[in-house]
Protein backbone atom coordinates (compact mmCIF):
# COMPACT_ATOMS: atom_id res chain seq x y z
CA UNK A 1 0.00 0.00 0.00
CA UNK A 2 1.47 3.28 -1.13
CA UNK A 3 0.01 5.30 1.73
CA UNK A 4 1.06 2.84 4.42
CA UNK A 5 4.55 2.70 2.96
CA UNK A 6 4.78 6.49 3.04
CA UNK A 7 3.51 6.54 6.63
CA UNK A 8 6.00 4.08 7.98
CA UNK A 9 8.90 5.52 6.03
CA UNK A 10 8.14 8.75 7.89
CA UNK A 11 8.01 7.01 11.21
CA UNK A 12 11.22 5.11 10.52
CA UNK A 13 13.18 8.33 10.87
CA UNK A 14 11.09 9.91 13.62
CA UNK A 15 13.63 9.34 16.39
CA UNK A 16 16.42 11.12 14.52
CA UNK A 17 14.30 14.12 13.59
CA UNK A 18 12.68 14.65 16.96
CA UNK A 19 16.06 14.58 18.66
CA UNK A 20 17.00 17.54 16.50
CA UNK A 21 13.81 19.34 17.53
CA UNK A 22 14.13 18.43 21.25
CA UNK A 23 11.32 15.89 21.15
CA UNK A 24 13.30 13.15 22.76
CA UNK A 25 10.97 10.27 23.63
CA UNK A 26 9.66 8.80 20.42
CA UNK A 27 7.31 5.86 20.75
CA UNK A 28 6.49 3.46 17.96
CA UNK A 29 3.35 4.17 16.00
CA UNK A 30 0.62 4.50 18.61
CA UNK A 31 2.39 1.97 20.84
CA UNK A 32 -0.68 -0.26 20.93
CA UNK A 33 -0.95 -3.57 22.69
CA UNK A 34 -0.83 -6.71 20.58
CA UNK A 35 -4.59 -7.21 20.87
CA UNK A 36 -5.20 -3.89 19.15
CA UNK A 37 -2.54 -4.09 16.43
CA UNK A 38 -3.17 -4.75 12.77
CA UNK A 39 -0.63 -5.14 10.04
CA UNK A 40 1.06 -1.88 9.11
CA UNK A 41 0.23 -2.15 5.43
CA UNK A 42 -3.50 -2.42 6.12
CA UNK A 43 -3.84 0.20 8.86
CA UNK A 44 -5.89 2.62 6.77
CA UNK A 45 -7.45 0.12 4.39
CA UNK A 46 -10.57 -0.27 6.54
CA UNK A 47 -12.76 1.67 8.92
CA UNK A 48 -11.58 -0.65 11.66
CA UNK A 49 -8.00 0.33 10.90
CA UNK A 50 -8.84 4.01 11.16
CA UNK A 51 -10.50 3.41 14.51
CA UNK A 52 -7.49 1.43 15.71
CA UNK A 53 -5.24 4.37 14.89
CA UNK A 54 -7.58 6.86 16.56
CA UNK A 55 -8.04 4.66 19.62
CA UNK A 56 -4.27 4.49 19.92
CA UNK A 57 -4.11 8.26 20.30
CA UNK A 58 -6.72 8.18 23.07
CA UNK A 59 -4.76 5.44 24.81
CA UNK A 60 -1.59 7.53 24.65
CA UNK A 61 -3.38 10.43 26.33
CA UNK A 62 -3.08 8.35 29.50
CA UNK A 63 0.71 8.55 29.35
CA UNK A 64 2.20 9.81 32.62
CA UNK A 65 3.38 12.97 30.83
CA UNK A 66 -0.21 13.75 29.85
CA UNK A 67 -3.49 12.93 31.62
CA UNK A 68 -2.02 9.91 33.35
CA UNK A 69 -0.16 12.25 35.69
CA UNK A 70 1.25 15.62 34.66
CA UNK A 71 -1.97 17.22 33.41
CA UNK A 72 -4.40 15.73 35.90
CA UNK A 73 -3.16 15.42 39.47
CA UNK A 74 0.60 15.56 39.70
CA UNK A 75 3.14 18.01 38.22
CA UNK A 76 1.22 21.26 38.16
CA UNK A 77 -0.60 20.57 41.41
CA UNK A 78 2.80 20.00 43.01
CA UNK A 79 4.12 23.25 41.51
CA UNK A 80 1.00 25.00 42.82
CA UNK A 81 1.96 23.65 46.27
CA UNK A 82 -1.37 21.96 46.86
CA UNK A 83 0.47 19.10 48.53
CA UNK A 84 2.62 19.01 51.64
CA UNK A 85 6.09 18.37 50.18
CA UNK A 86 8.12 20.47 52.62
CA UNK A 87 10.36 17.78 54.04
CA UNK A 88 13.78 17.46 52.36
CA UNK A 89 13.42 13.71 51.98
CA UNK A 90 10.04 14.04 50.23
CA UNK A 91 10.29 12.76 46.65
CA UNK A 92 8.60 15.85 45.21
CA UNK A 93 10.19 18.47 47.47
CA UNK A 94 12.48 19.93 44.80
CA UNK A 95 9.70 20.20 42.25
CA UNK A 96 7.41 21.88 44.77
CA UNK A 97 10.05 24.57 45.36
CA UNK A 98 10.56 25.16 41.62
CA UNK A 99 13.96 23.52 41.42
CA UNK A 100 14.83 24.09 37.76
CA UNK A 101 16.27 20.65 37.11
CA UNK A 102 13.27 18.90 38.65
CA UNK A 103 10.82 21.17 36.87
CA UNK A 104 12.52 20.77 33.49
CA UNK A 105 12.54 17.01 33.84
CA UNK A 106 8.79 16.91 34.46
CA UNK A 107 7.63 19.56 32.02
CA UNK A 108 9.85 18.56 29.10
CA UNK A 109 8.09 15.20 29.03
CA UNK A 110 4.84 16.99 28.21
CA UNK A 111 6.38 18.84 25.26
CA UNK A 112 8.05 15.69 23.91
CA UNK A 113 4.99 13.48 24.21
CA UNK A 114 2.64 16.00 22.64
CA UNK A 115 4.73 16.64 19.55
CA UNK A 116 5.42 12.94 19.08
CA UNK A 117 1.71 12.20 19.33
CA UNK A 118 0.84 15.01 16.92
CA UNK A 119 2.66 13.14 14.14
CA UNK A 120 0.18 10.31 14.63
CA UNK A 121 -2.82 12.65 14.83
CA UNK A 122 -1.81 14.46 11.64
CA UNK A 123 -1.29 11.15 9.85
CA UNK A 124 -4.88 10.19 10.69
CA UNK A 125 -6.20 13.56 9.49
CA UNK A 126 -4.32 13.22 6.20
CA UNK A 127 -5.47 9.62 5.78
CA UNK A 128 -9.11 10.68 6.11
CA UNK A 129 -8.79 12.51 2.79
CA UNK A 130 -6.13 10.38 1.08
CA UNK A 131 -8.12 7.21 1.79
CA UNK A 132 -11.59 8.73 1.92
CA UNK A 133 -13.09 5.94 -0.17
CA UNK A 134 -12.52 3.56 2.75
CA UNK A 135 -14.83 5.48 5.07
CA UNK A 136 -18.58 5.93 4.93
CA UNK A 137 -19.84 9.45 5.50
CA UNK A 138 -20.49 9.01 9.23
CA UNK A 139 -17.07 7.57 9.96
CA UNK A 140 -15.30 10.16 7.83
CA UNK A 141 -16.91 13.07 9.65
CA UNK A 142 -16.56 11.59 13.13
CA UNK A 143 -12.98 10.33 12.77
CA UNK A 144 -11.66 13.48 11.12
CA UNK A 145 -13.64 15.65 13.53
CA UNK A 146 -12.24 13.89 16.58
CA UNK A 147 -8.70 13.97 15.16
CA UNK A 148 -8.86 17.71 14.49
CA UNK A 149 -10.17 18.25 18.01
CA UNK A 150 -7.31 16.16 19.38
CA UNK A 151 -4.85 18.32 17.46
CA UNK A 152 -6.34 21.45 18.96
CA UNK A 153 -6.43 19.94 22.44
CA UNK A 154 -2.81 18.73 22.40
CA UNK A 155 -1.55 22.12 21.27
CA UNK A 156 -3.73 23.83 23.88
CA UNK A 157 -2.14 21.87 26.70
CA UNK A 158 1.36 22.86 25.54
CA UNK A 159 0.14 26.44 25.02
CA UNK A 160 -1.11 26.73 28.59
CA UNK A 161 2.27 25.63 29.93
CA UNK A 162 4.77 27.19 27.55
CA UNK A 163 2.82 30.16 26.24
CA UNK A 164 2.88 33.67 27.69
CA UNK A 165 0.28 35.25 29.92
CA UNK A 166 -2.01 35.88 26.99
CA UNK A 167 -3.63 39.04 28.29
CA UNK A 168 -0.18 40.59 28.78
CA UNK A 169 1.76 39.60 25.67
CA UNK A 170 -0.10 37.67 22.96
CA UNK A 171 2.63 38.43 20.40
CA UNK A 172 5.36 36.45 22.16
CA UNK A 173 6.76 33.60 20.06
CA UNK A 174 6.20 30.47 22.11
CA UNK A 175 5.71 27.19 20.22
CA UNK A 176 5.35 25.58 16.78
CA UNK A 177 2.00 24.41 15.44
CA UNK A 178 2.09 20.96 13.88
CA UNK A 179 -0.37 20.65 10.99
CA UNK A 180 1.40 17.98 8.95
CA UNK A 181 2.81 14.52 9.51
CA UNK A 182 6.06 15.47 7.81
CA UNK A 183 8.99 15.78 10.16
CA UNK A 184 10.23 19.22 9.24
CA UNK A 185 11.41 21.53 11.98
CA UNK A 186 8.75 24.22 12.39
CA UNK A 187 9.27 27.77 13.60
CA UNK A 188 7.98 29.16 16.86
CA UNK A 189 4.76 31.08 16.31
CA UNK A 190 3.32 34.06 18.12
CA UNK A 191 0.83 33.14 20.81
CA UNK A 192 -1.94 34.91 18.90
CA UNK A 193 -1.24 32.76 15.83
CA UNK A 194 -1.22 29.58 17.89
CA UNK A 195 -4.55 30.57 19.45
CA UNK A 196 -6.04 31.22 16.02
CA UNK A 197 -4.89 27.84 14.69
CA UNK A 198 -6.24 26.01 17.74
CA UNK A 199 -9.59 27.73 17.32
CA UNK A 200 -9.59 26.87 13.61
CA UNK A 201 -9.10 23.19 14.47
CA UNK A 202 -11.82 23.20 17.11
CA UNK A 203 -14.25 25.02 14.80
CA UNK A 204 -13.49 22.62 11.94
CA UNK A 205 -14.09 19.70 14.29
CA UNK A 206 -17.38 21.22 15.41
CA UNK A 207 -18.50 21.57 11.80
CA UNK A 208 -17.60 17.98 10.93
CA UNK A 209 -19.31 16.51 13.98
CA UNK A 210 -22.48 18.57 14.10
CA UNK A 211 -24.58 16.37 11.77
CA UNK A 212 -22.92 13.03 12.48
CA UNK A 213 -22.01 12.62 16.14
CA UNK A 214 -24.53 10.30 17.87
CA UNK A 215 -24.10 12.31 21.08
CA UNK A 216 -26.33 15.06 19.66
CA UNK A 217 -29.46 12.90 19.43
CA UNK A 218 -28.69 10.11 21.88
CA UNK A 219 -26.34 11.47 24.52
CA UNK A 220 -23.27 9.85 26.03
CA UNK A 221 -24.42 6.31 25.15
CA UNK A 222 -23.00 4.41 28.09
CA UNK A 223 -23.41 0.65 28.08
CA UNK A 224 -26.66 -0.57 26.52
CA UNK A 225 -27.93 2.90 25.64
CA UNK A 226 -26.93 2.64 21.98
CA UNK A 227 -28.75 -0.35 20.42
CA UNK A 228 -28.15 -0.60 16.69
CA UNK A 229 -25.00 1.52 16.80
CA UNK A 230 -21.55 0.07 16.20
CA UNK A 231 -19.26 -0.01 19.23
CA UNK A 232 -17.18 2.74 17.63
CA UNK A 233 -20.09 5.16 18.00
CA UNK A 234 -21.05 4.60 21.64
CA UNK A 235 -19.37 5.71 24.87
CA UNK A 236 -19.21 9.22 23.47
CA UNK A 237 -17.91 10.65 26.75
CA UNK A 238 -14.70 8.74 26.07
CA UNK A 239 -14.21 10.57 22.77
CA UNK A 240 -13.81 14.21 21.84
CA UNK A 241 -17.47 14.42 20.95
CA UNK A 242 -19.42 17.39 19.60
CA UNK A 243 -20.25 18.87 22.99
CA UNK A 244 -16.74 18.38 24.35
CA UNK A 245 -15.44 20.27 21.31
CA UNK A 246 -17.84 23.14 21.96
CA UNK A 247 -16.70 23.17 25.58
CA UNK A 248 -13.08 23.48 24.46
CA UNK A 249 -14.02 26.37 22.21
CA UNK A 250 -15.52 28.07 25.27
CA UNK A 251 -12.40 27.35 27.34
CA UNK A 252 -10.01 28.61 24.66
CA UNK A 253 -12.08 31.72 24.03
CA UNK A 254 -12.04 32.60 27.72
CA UNK A 255 -8.31 31.90 27.89
CA UNK A 256 -7.65 34.38 25.10
CA UNK A 257 -10.01 37.02 26.46
CA UNK A 258 -12.90 36.52 24.03
CA UNK A 259 -15.59 36.44 26.68
CA UNK A 260 -18.44 36.89 24.21
CA UNK A 261 -17.57 33.68 22.36
CA UNK A 262 -16.86 31.85 25.60
CA UNK A 263 -20.27 32.85 26.96
CA UNK A 264 -22.08 31.89 23.76
CA UNK A 265 -20.58 28.41 23.62
CA UNK A 266 -20.93 27.73 27.34
CA UNK A 267 -24.60 28.66 27.16
CA UNK A 268 -25.07 26.40 24.14
CA UNK A 269 -23.50 23.39 25.83
CA UNK A 270 -25.64 23.83 28.95
CA UNK A 271 -28.82 24.35 26.95
CA UNK A 272 -28.31 21.46 24.55
CA UNK A 273 -27.07 18.89 27.08
CA UNK A 274 -29.02 19.71 30.25
CA UNK A 275 -31.99 21.92 29.42
CA UNK A 276 -33.20 20.68 26.02
CA UNK A 277 -31.97 17.15 26.72
CA UNK A 278 -30.66 15.19 29.68
CA UNK A 279 -27.43 14.01 28.09
CA UNK A 280 -24.96 15.15 30.77
CA UNK A 281 -26.94 15.71 33.99
CA UNK A 282 -25.39 16.71 37.28
CA UNK A 283 -24.56 13.83 39.58
CA UNK A 284 -27.42 13.02 41.94
CA UNK A 285 -27.12 13.26 45.70
CA UNK A 286 -27.77 9.52 45.93
CA UNK A 287 -24.91 8.67 43.59
CA UNK A 288 -22.53 11.12 45.25
CA UNK A 289 -23.36 10.42 48.89
CA UNK A 290 -25.62 7.48 49.70
CA UNK A 291 -23.56 5.36 47.33
CA UNK A 292 -20.41 7.24 48.14
CA UNK A 293 -18.06 4.41 47.37
CA UNK A 294 -19.31 4.28 43.81
CA UNK A 295 -19.36 7.48 41.77
CA UNK A 296 -16.68 9.77 43.18
CA UNK A 297 -15.81 11.16 39.72
CA UNK A 298 -19.38 12.29 38.85
CA UNK A 299 -19.53 10.24 35.69
CA UNK A 300 -22.71 11.74 34.23
CA UNK A 301 -21.13 15.21 34.12
CA UNK A 302 -18.04 14.23 32.14
CA UNK A 303 -18.12 15.70 28.65
CA UNK A 304 -14.78 14.09 27.90
CA UNK A 305 -12.84 11.58 29.92
CA UNK A 306 -10.43 8.70 29.47
CA UNK A 307 -10.90 5.04 30.32
CA UNK A 308 -7.96 3.95 32.44
CA UNK A 309 -7.96 0.29 33.43
CA UNK A 310 -5.11 1.06 35.82
CA UNK A 311 -6.72 4.04 37.48
CA UNK A 312 -6.60 2.40 40.89
CA UNK A 313 -2.81 2.48 40.52
CA UNK A 314 -3.08 6.26 40.67
CA UNK A 315 -4.47 5.97 44.17
CA UNK A 316 -2.20 3.17 45.32
CA UNK A 317 1.02 4.83 44.11
CA UNK A 318 0.19 8.44 44.96
CA UNK A 319 -2.58 8.97 47.52
CA UNK A 320 -2.99 5.76 49.53
CA UNK A 321 -2.82 5.91 53.32
CA UNK A 322 -0.44 2.92 53.09
CA UNK A 323 2.26 5.15 51.59
CA UNK A 324 4.93 6.76 53.70
CA UNK A 325 5.53 10.50 53.93
CA UNK A 326 8.37 10.27 51.42
CA UNK A 327 6.17 9.46 48.44
CA UNK A 328 2.56 10.30 49.29
CA UNK A 329 0.92 13.37 47.81
CA UNK A 330 -1.35 14.80 50.50
CA UNK A 331 -2.19 18.34 51.56
CA UNK A 332 -2.19 19.22 55.22
CA UNK A 333 -5.62 18.94 56.83
CA UNK A 334 -5.68 22.73 57.14
CA UNK A 335 -5.02 23.16 53.43
CA UNK A 336 -7.74 20.66 52.59
CA UNK A 337 -10.26 22.58 54.64
CA UNK A 338 -9.18 25.86 53.05
CA UNK A 339 -10.36 24.54 49.68
CA UNK A 340 -13.97 24.53 50.87
CA UNK A 341 -16.09 27.25 52.43
CA UNK A 342 -16.11 26.91 56.20
CA UNK A 343 -19.87 27.37 56.54
CA UNK A 344 -20.78 24.85 53.86
CA UNK A 345 -18.02 22.24 53.73
CA UNK A 346 -19.90 19.76 55.92
CA UNK A 347 -22.54 19.53 53.19
CA UNK A 348 -20.19 19.74 50.21
CA UNK A 349 -20.10 16.33 48.54
CA UNK A 350 -16.59 16.94 47.24
CA UNK A 351 -15.34 17.41 50.80
CA UNK A 352 -17.37 14.67 52.48
CA UNK A 353 -16.99 11.97 49.83
CA UNK A 354 -13.63 12.55 48.12
CA UNK A 355 -11.62 12.87 51.34
CA UNK A 356 -11.49 10.16 53.97
CA UNK A 357 -9.84 10.11 57.39
CA UNK A 358 -7.55 7.08 57.42
CA UNK A 359 -4.59 5.92 59.47
CA UNK A 360 -1.17 6.37 57.89
CA UNK A 361 1.61 3.74 58.34
CA UNK A 362 2.50 5.32 61.70
CA UNK A 363 -1.07 5.04 62.97
CA UNK A 364 -1.84 8.76 62.68
CA UNK A 365 -5.30 9.69 61.45
CA UNK A 366 -5.15 12.06 58.47
CA UNK A 367 -7.39 12.98 55.57
CA UNK A 368 -6.55 11.21 52.32
CA UNK A 369 -7.75 11.87 48.79
CA UNK A 370 -9.86 8.87 47.75
CA UNK A 371 -11.37 10.06 44.48
CA UNK A 372 -9.34 7.48 42.54
CA UNK A 373 -9.59 4.65 45.07
CA UNK A 374 -10.63 1.34 43.50
CA UNK A 375 -14.33 0.54 43.44
CA UNK A 376 -15.48 -2.91 44.54
CA UNK A 377 -17.64 -4.47 41.83
CA UNK A 378 -19.01 -7.24 44.04
CA UNK A 379 -21.44 -5.11 46.03
CA UNK A 380 -24.12 -2.52 45.51
CA UNK A 381 -27.20 -2.17 43.29
CA UNK A 382 -26.85 -3.48 39.75
CA UNK A 383 -27.28 -0.04 38.22
CA UNK A 384 -24.27 1.27 40.14
CA UNK A 385 -21.78 -1.49 39.51
CA UNK A 386 -18.32 -0.97 38.06
CA UNK A 387 -19.69 -1.86 34.64
CA UNK A 388 -20.77 1.76 34.52
CA UNK A 389 -17.15 2.77 34.57
CA UNK A 390 -16.81 4.66 37.84
CA UNK A 391 -13.59 2.95 38.76
CA UNK A 392 -11.86 3.51 35.43
CA UNK A 393 -12.76 7.07 34.46
CA UNK A 394 -10.22 9.90 34.40
CA UNK A 395 -12.18 13.16 33.94
CA UNK A 396 -10.77 15.70 31.47
CA UNK A 397 -13.65 18.12 30.72
CA UNK A 398 -16.85 18.54 32.76
CA UNK A 399 -20.15 20.28 32.16
CA UNK A 400 -19.57 22.16 35.43
CA UNK A 401 -16.88 24.28 33.76
CA UNK A 402 -19.52 25.72 31.43
CA UNK A 403 -21.46 27.01 34.44
CA UNK A 404 -18.35 28.73 35.77
CA UNK A 405 -17.69 30.31 32.37
CA UNK A 406 -21.22 31.72 32.25
CA UNK A 407 -20.85 33.01 35.80
CA UNK A 408 -17.59 34.73 34.89
CA UNK A 409 -18.50 36.10 31.46
CA UNK A 410 -22.13 37.15 31.72
CA UNK A 411 -22.87 40.86 32.16
CA UNK A 412 -26.26 39.87 33.55
CA UNK A 413 -25.66 39.47 37.25
CA UNK A 414 -28.84 37.48 37.76
CA UNK A 415 -27.76 35.00 35.09
CA UNK A 416 -24.27 34.78 36.54
CA UNK A 417 -25.52 34.02 40.05
CA UNK A 418 -28.17 31.63 38.77
CA UNK A 419 -25.53 29.50 37.04
CA UNK A 420 -23.17 29.68 39.99
CA UNK A 421 -25.91 28.61 42.38
CA UNK A 422 -27.12 25.80 40.13
CA UNK A 423 -23.61 24.40 40.26
CA UNK A 424 -23.36 24.90 44.02
CA UNK A 425 -26.65 23.06 44.48
CA UNK A 426 -25.21 20.18 42.45
CA UNK A 427 -22.47 19.89 45.07
CA UNK A 428 -24.74 20.12 48.10
CA UNK A 429 -23.69 23.71 48.81
CA UNK A 430 -26.01 26.59 49.76
CA UNK A 431 -26.60 29.49 47.40
CA UNK A 432 -24.03 32.26 47.23
CA UNK A 433 -25.06 35.66 48.52
CA UNK A 434 -25.94 37.78 45.50
CA UNK A 435 -25.01 40.89 47.46
CA UNK A 436 -21.43 39.85 46.75
CA UNK A 437 -22.16 40.78 43.17
CA UNK A 438 -21.65 44.42 44.02
CA UNK A 439 -17.98 43.79 44.69
CA UNK A 440 -17.83 41.48 41.67
CA UNK A 441 -18.93 44.25 39.33
CA UNK A 442 -16.67 46.78 41.02
CA UNK A 443 -13.66 44.66 40.10
CA UNK A 444 -14.55 44.53 36.41
Where are the language model's segments positioned?
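Membrane-proximal, proline-rich intrinsically disordered regions
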Residues: 26-75, 99, 308, 431-432
